[in-house]
Amino acid sequence: MKKSFRILFISLLCFSLTGLSFTIDTANKDSLKVVFLDDPVVAKFDSMLLANFTNSESIFEGSVTSPTEAPSYSDSIYTLRIEALNKKTPIDLVFNPYVKQYIKVYTQRRRTQMSRMMGLAAFYFPMFEEVLDQFDLPLELKYLAIVESALNPRAKSWAGATGLWQFMYNTGKEYDLKISSYVDERMDPYRATVAACMYFQSSYNLYKDWSLVLASYNSGRGNVNKAIRRSGGHKNYWKIRRFLPKETRSYVPAFIAVCYAMNYADKHGISPEEPKFLHYEIDTIEVKYQIDFQYLSKIVDISISELEFLNPAYKINVIPFIDERAYHLVLPVSKMGVFVQNESEIYNHFSALDALKQKSYPKYSEEDERIVHRVRNGEYLGKIASRYGCSVSKIKKWNNLKSDAISVGQRLVLFVRPDYV
């Protein structure tokens, strides 16, 4: 579906990120010695969690996981537990040394993070399961969002993959996720989940194997197809694994480990960090006029950070009103009555602002597209800017250029209007 690039690893003391280099225990003869250095899947997990979004006091009530005790079990116990999970799903769940290294990550080295994931899962998973069921897909696919985004709906990789399900710009467009100056529907939990399910369904129709569906979600179908050809035509993930990109080689083992960790967290002394909101405590209403969070927070007595958590798709804290697309406001059930009671007053307030032009909002328009331009002979920044309808200063900002000097073959990241692509 998309090329998933390795997210830059950010080291913060509060997360104790000291476990990225380790060797698998070789006490058992059947285990492998694996050097686990700056693993791309773990780096992604940490990077997503380090975002302020999942650390906000507006989301969690407080941690209950003890950071000291981290039980470990024999390979035979892990095998029995994963076999029990495997009987409940059509996705092939196996235990091997590659899976074991990620079980250690999630149950020993990232215990606090897993506690937060369990709390966020209580909020998001009921909706995931409902949509997965509508598409007749395995419910265990919900765990993939933990591997993808650490359940952060505003997660964004340096390559541009965005949201709970990490859609790239063009792939999001392909699955009808609108991106504008106001809204990025890749960050809309429900709409992005529907899009992810559409991808899962079409990918399964192609491969008839859920492990290959997972691999293709990470690296793209093209890379999976190439790996199948290079392996001699095998259509088993473990037989084509060595021909896949580095991150994808870790992706399915990490998924299996997350399935294990979420189902056996209690056996490892991990308890959920309770979220402030649960899925049955929120309600949704379609807006009938453009509104912003600042005024809304005063009317219904809710913090802006809580509005952002419940409504992550709105980029500048404004919910637009357009004829072509319905947009919704999500509020706690306890606040929805206040909104409905004051709905006319709220809309009249913004209507008056528009009439008096006291508040200026950007025009609703499709967002510029991210492209990469390779510098050709004879090109300079001014010429490139003219070609793509942007400014030299913006090109320098996008690419962290200190001067106007560029070289032939250099790659420049540009954000341009669709008509210039």
Regions found by a protein language model. Give the residues of each.
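Substrate-binding clefts and substrate-entry loops adjacent to catalytic sites
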Residues: 102-116, 151-158, 166-208, 228-242
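An acidic, Gly/Ser/Thr/Pro-rich helix-cap/linker signature
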Residues: 20-135
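Primarily a LysM-type cell-wall glycan-binding module
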Residues: 273-304, 360-391, 402, 407-411
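Bacterial Sec-dependent N-terminal signal peptides
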Residues: 1-31
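Extracellular LysM carbohydrate-binding repeats and other cell-envelope/extracellular binding modules
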Residues: 244, 310-346, 371, 391-421
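Short, functionally critical alpha-helical segments immediately adjacent to catalytic or ligand/cofactor-binding
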Residues: 137-154, 213-218, 308-311, 395-399, ...
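Solvent-exposed, acidic/flexible segments
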Residues: 110, 114-121, 125, 134-137, ...
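Extracytoplasmic/secreted proteins, especially bacterial periplasmic and envelope-associated proteins
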Residues: 98-102, 116, 120-123, 127, ...
